[in-house]
């Protein structure tokens, strides 16, 4: 569908701010910046920093409910640097317990040289084994929900879910 040439000057008529400009630093956000100084950014001894990740076929959780997108090598594992595995007596492919302040999950771990030491990564969109999800195909796909580890009370000036920077402990499962 061709909508014709772009027309300059249309944005201001579509903005509902008094100035007809995009406010990139609203007062509400600026007033909240002081809270950032209160955020603990360093993990404690023995803790690692959990970050999320996405895959082109795992971008959203509903994608696990279609067989075509769940084919191929498993992508649900916790990625962890080999040095962090060794220091905890964990072997690539073993099951581990990942514990945060608010919850814990058990998942398979995968050694990944491209992970920064001290950082672990769980993919977004897994963990449909819970009753009532209505995702029959996705319930058969292994993996855990990163939401079980993220802290709903975590300070975050953006107001978004804090899926990255979560302090966790990783130990052999069992």
Spell out what each predicted region is:
Residues 1-68:
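Long, low-complexity segments enriched in small/aliphatic residues
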Residues 61-79, 83-174:
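Long, contiguous, secondary-structure-rich segments that constitute the structural scaffold
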